[in-house]
Design a protein with these regions (language model features):
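Non-catalytic terminal extensions that flank enzyme cores
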Residues: 1-47
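His/Glu-based metal-binding/catalytic segments typifying zinc-dependent metallopeptidases
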Residues: 40-42, 49-51, 162, 166-170, ...
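M16 family metallopeptidases and their MPP-like homologs
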Residues: 45-55, 81-129, 136-147, 174-199, ...
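Active-site His/Glu-centered metal-binding helix of metallohydrolases
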Residues: 62, 66-70, 578
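Generic recognition of flexible, low-complexity loop/linker segments
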Residues: 94, 210-214, 273-276, 319, ...
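Hydrophobic, small-residue-rich alpha-helical packing segments that form membrane-like cores
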Residues: 150-219, 225-243, 247-275, 280-282
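Non-catalytic, conformational "gating/processing" segments within enzyme and secreted inhibitor domains
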Residues: 158, 210-242, 704, 726-760, ...
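Extended, regular secondary-structure scaffolds
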Residues: 211, 223, 232-251, 374, ...
Length: 974
């Protein structure tokens, strides 16, 4: 029997997706009208997604709050948080839900057939039969609610989405993205914020929330996607019999309307908050935005990806260079958003000034006119096409399942025309078309039509306002106080009662019989086998080579690892500057823009990084190895070009180019500032660990706050510091880029080894051979600071860290289970559910470093108190066998992620450099699979050791940090 014999469905379309080694089928469920798309192939990492078109009508965030809420219990799975139960106890390779400006999607992935079916079941039940109709507590917890602990207390607002969006609105980049979208589409769903504006979220009522679900969460408005190696007939039958056949086809008005084009460009000015001590000079964002056709034009969809590369994204691209040369901003970037119905092309200048607006527009338009008149750089176009085609063919999405990313891309057309779901999956003919157009004037015509003649655009200015956060907080507090003052005693008592009831609901544990309904695997479903390690030590041209032999589809993945021992502590930031500079600065034979194009015409790209390794057999010595790594990938016949370009970058870069160095420092400063607002939790944890860990101090000095402080100092005092900077860069390059300082990591199939060895032989003896100073071990000095960093953010990132091995507690595999237990039980319940933070996590590694962190957290003192309570929680840890199994399975899920060829090679090399043997991994896996509750209780000592270290760092709002100033040894503005 085949899917054609299933009477419940009508087959509308089939496609041979040979480039993706898949067969595509589009169906419609006859009774309910549900749209279904299958991608059949031999990928064991199966994906299921159900999505809904959910255009918002206001900025109350109802699509986002709904996305959170439906995963908080359903008809068949009435536990309070089935999502967390699945995270804890499934072998998922992806499990999440996402709200977009016009859709909400619920994807899951797993390699285990039984687990995959369980995930599908819970998600289908969640979206169609959520418990949101039973009571309003989920809405109040995930969305918003008034919080009043006692009649005389302060009235506040809490809610997970509310706090998440307060964090999102604290970032100028977040403000910019939102205002650009809103500015271009005043008459459709893109005019409002689907995630929710914190000022508007409290306008949403419970009844409006339920109405949104009734309207949009119906099979007639659904898009169901199945990908991978599975019995599609069985899945389709199950979907029909279990869910879809319960519904009749209903008309659902969820159409995304096209915005009528503007007759002239619009201008929008919006403020964002900076800390009271920050300068408002060079802190404005300017954005030039144009609407580019629709996402249903597959040629345009890819052509502007290429133009984004050629005009803006590549180092030295003409728009970027023109704006930098004109001094309009210090960090120029491009953005091409083709994930909405009408894609948006943006030119963004960061660290500019408001009065530069006219110059910004003039430089962009004059540069574009010149490009149209004299022609675009053809090599840049070819490089852009090759870059995107290489990525399409390689299909390396890092940690994300391939099928997940294909599914999300399907929505780029399927959502707007249900007859065209596959147009972006068949990209090779489009790439061939674009290659043929390079010399025809096609791309110049696109620039003229869509960027110069097109009046459907906007200029967006995001400018700083000192103390805006404090002012808005005061306005909200005054508004809430006025509201409270207007209430009768009975109404105030009702608020106190509602607050208490929500807290009691959050304290309640789900009934054991309800928890038992969540399907879980047993330990017996898990293999004790570890993933293979692919390390074979060889020698090539007098250099150690570690070969990772796996099937790579004809691509060779190369990394040159240069040892950094002997670089003194005060020069560590300069290593990172060198790493950032190489590849985007002129070389002897290429201007940096041409260098980048040459690389991307012939290869899959070259990048650099700094990595840290430690001998896990000698953790008490606290010794570690730092390496400067240059990595690249290319097809085997292009290995000689790859190595030639690597050598060009390492040996021929012009490290004395003052103008370019100044531009790069400004860009680095801007991007580090951004990362503190988007990834403040990792920044805070690293900084806190650096108080006592030499390895963490190295990392902070090269990638954290310590590094930022040096970059900022160099950028702001460039004229007096430039000679020292250049001398350091040259000296470090000469000291490290040497054949006697090198190990090579190479991932390929057996037949890819010879081309690599031949290519490396041509450059091996051209690395530095000058006599170098005798290297002395780098001594790193750690200082305990316990810092609070004030920012313009409305939320906190709270980190508590320590080293448990220093206090005599050994590492065990059970600590990996503890990460799951804390992150999805103790911390989740207390920091997220009750505290309202968007995220919380923990980590413990083989060298004894541990941390507890919160993310976009409205609290500070309360979170620290929760951290202090973790030891008592562990001492009293007591769950049934089923729950214990769940924690173990969730732990294995984090370990057993499917790996692409590049990941198999890099994992193997990582184990090699850290001296981790197969026996150690096997022992850790057995410790996880054999763990008992007593093993978890014994870990109270680990947490006690961590807390006894008294190391903490907080990045957050001025107000909260000043309120708790006695907590810190130092308070600074970031």
């Amino acid at each position: 029997m085949s899917i054609y014999d299933l009477n419940a469905y009508e087959v509308l379309q089939t496609e041979d997706l040979s480039d993706l080694k898949s067969k595509g089928t589009l169906l419609k469920h006859k009774k309910s009208g549900a749209r279904v798309l299958l991608m059949e192939n031999d990928d064991e990492n199966k994906v299921f997604t159900i999505g809904f078109r959910t255009p918002p009508s206001d900025s109350t965030g109802v699509p986002h709050i709904m996305e959170h809420s439906v995963l908080c219990g359903s008809k068949e799975f009435p536990v309070k948080d089935p999502f967390v139960e699945l995270v804890k106890g499934s072998l998922n390779t992806f499990l999440n839900a996402m709200t977009y400006p016009d859709k909400t999607v619920y994807p899951v992935a797993s390699c285990n057939d039984k687990d995959f079916q369980n995930l599908m079941h819970v998600y289908m039940d969640a979206v169609f039969y959520p418990n949101i109709y039973q009571h309003d507590k989920t809405f109040r917890q995930e969305g918003w609610s008034y919080k009043l602990d006692d009649p005389d207390g302060e009235l506040t607002i809490s809610g997970v989405v509310y706090n998440e969006m307060k964090g999102a609105f604290s970032s100028p980049e977040g403000v910019l993205d939102r205002v650009v979208l809103n500015s271009l589409f005043p008459d459709n769903a893109y005019s409002v914020e689907s995630g929710g504006d914190p000022e508007m979220i409290p306008e949403l009522t419970y009844e409006q929330f339920l109405d949104f679900h009734r309207k949009y969460y119906h099979p007639s408005n659904s898009y169901i996607y199945l990908y991978g190696d599975m019995d599609m007939e069985e899945k389709l039958r199950w979907l029909d019999e279990k869910y879809l056949s319960d519904f009749e086809n209903e008309p659902v008005d969820s159409e995304i309307h096209l915005q009528k084009p503007f007759t002239e460009m619009k201008e929008v000015v919006q403020e964002y908050s900076i800390a009271s001590e920050e300068s408002d000079e060079d802190n404005t964002y300017l954005s030039y935005n144009k609407v580019i056709g629709t996402t249903l034009d597959e040629k345009l969809y890819l052509a502007f990806e290429i133009l984004d590369y050629a005009l803006l994204s590549a180092p030295g691209a003409p728009l970027k260079k023109a704006l930098l040369d004109a001094g309009v901003g210090k960090d120029i970037s491009g953005s091409y958003d083709n994930g909405v119905y009408q894609p948006i092309f943006s030119v963004i200048s960061k660290n500019a000034n408001v009065e530069q607006k006219e110059e910004f527009i003039r430089v962009i338009e004059d540069t574009l006119k010149d490009i149209v008149k004299n022609g675009i750089n053809k090599k840049a176009l070819r490089a852009g096409i090759n870059y995107h085609e290489f990525r399409f063919r390689e299909a390396d999405f890092g940690n994300y399942p391939r099928g997940l990313m294909y599914g999300l891309q399907l929505f780029d057309s399927w959502l707007y025309d249900e007859t065209k779901p596959f147009i972006h999956m068949q990209a090779i003919p489009t790439f061939e078309f674009l290659k043929e157009q390079v010399e025809t004037g096609y791309f110049e015509e696109l620039i003229q039509k869509y960027l110069l003649d097109n009046t459907h655009g906007s200029i967006v200015i995001i400018k700083p306002e000192r103390g805006r956060t404090a002012r808005m907080d005061k306005e909200l507090a005054d508004k809430l106080q006025a509201y409270k003052d207007s209430l009768s005693k009975e109404e105030i008592d009702a608020l106190v009662k509602a607050t208490k009831e929500l807290e009691e609901y959050q304290e309640e544990e789900s009934a054991p019989e309800d928890l038992a309904k969540i399907p879980v695997l047993g330990r017996e479903d898990i293999s004790r086998e570890i993933a293979p390690i692919y390390n074979k030590e060889l020698e090539t041209s007098g250099v150690k080579l570690v070969h990772h032999e796996v099937e790579t589809n004809g691509i060779g993945y190369t990394a040159l690892l240069f040892d950094l021992s002997g670089i003194p502590e005060e020069k560590l930031p300069y290593i990172s500057i060198l790493q950032s500079v190489l590849g985007i600065i002129n070389t002897k034979n290429y201007e940096y823009s041409e260098l980048f194009n040459e690389i991307n015409v012939h290869t899959g790209g070259i990048g650099t990084s700094l990595e840290l390794y430690t001998d896990v057999t000698k953790v008490k010595e606290k010794e570690f190895r730092a390496t400067f790594e240059i990595k690249g990938k290319a097809l085997y016949p292009k290995m000689d070009v790859l190595f030639s370009m690597m050598r060009e970058i390492l040996m021929e870069s012009d490290l004395g180019d003052e103008k370019r160095l100044k531009e790069i420092l400004a860009m680095l400063k801007s991007r580090l500032q951004m990362s503190f607002l988007s990834s403040g939790h990792t920044t805070a944890a690293l900084r806190s660990l650096s108080y006592t860990s030499p390895m963490a101090k190295f990392k902070d000095d090269t990638d954290g706050i310590g590094y930022y402080e040096v970059v900022k100092e160099l950028e702001e005092n460039f004229e007096e510091k430039k000679a020292e900077l250049i001398a350091n860069l040259r000296q470090i390059a000469q000291q490290i880029f040497r054949k006697d300082n090198l190990i090579i990591s190479y991932t390929s199939s057996a037949d890819g080894l010879a081309p690599m060895e031949e290519a490396f032989a041509k450059i091996a003896d051209t690395l530095h051979t000058e006599e170098k100073e005798a290297a002395t071990p780098c001594e790193i000095h750690c200082v305990k600071r316990n810092e609070g960093f004030k920012t313009s953010s409305k939320v906190q990132y709270v980190a508590r860290t320590g080293n448990f091995i220093d206090r005599g507690v050994e590492y065990t595999g059970a600590l990996q289970i503890l990460k799951v237990i804390l992150s999805y039980d103790y911390l989740w319940q207390n920091v997220r559910v009750k505290g309202g933070a968007y995220g919380c996590m923990s980590s413990f590694n083989r060298i004894g470093e541990g941390y507890l962190v919160s993310y976009r957290d409205p609290n500070l003192e309360k979170t620290m108190e929760i951290y202090e309570g973790v030891v008592e929680y562990l001492k009293n840890f007591n769950v049934d066998d089923r729950d214990m199994n769940k924690f173990i399975i969730g732990t294995i899920s984090n370990i057993d992620r499917p790996m692409n060829p590049a990941a198999k090679g890099s994992r193997s090399m990582n184990l090699y450099m850290n001296y981790v043997s197969a026996e150690m991994i096997r022992e850790e896996r057995n410790q996880i699979l054999d763990a008992q509750q007593s093993d978890i209780r014994a870990l109270a000592d680990v947490l006690q050791a961590l807390l006894d270290a008294h190391e903490l760092c907080v990045i957050g709002s001025e107000e909260k940090i000043e309120e708790q100033k006695e907590m810190f040894l130092e308070i600074k503005t970031l």
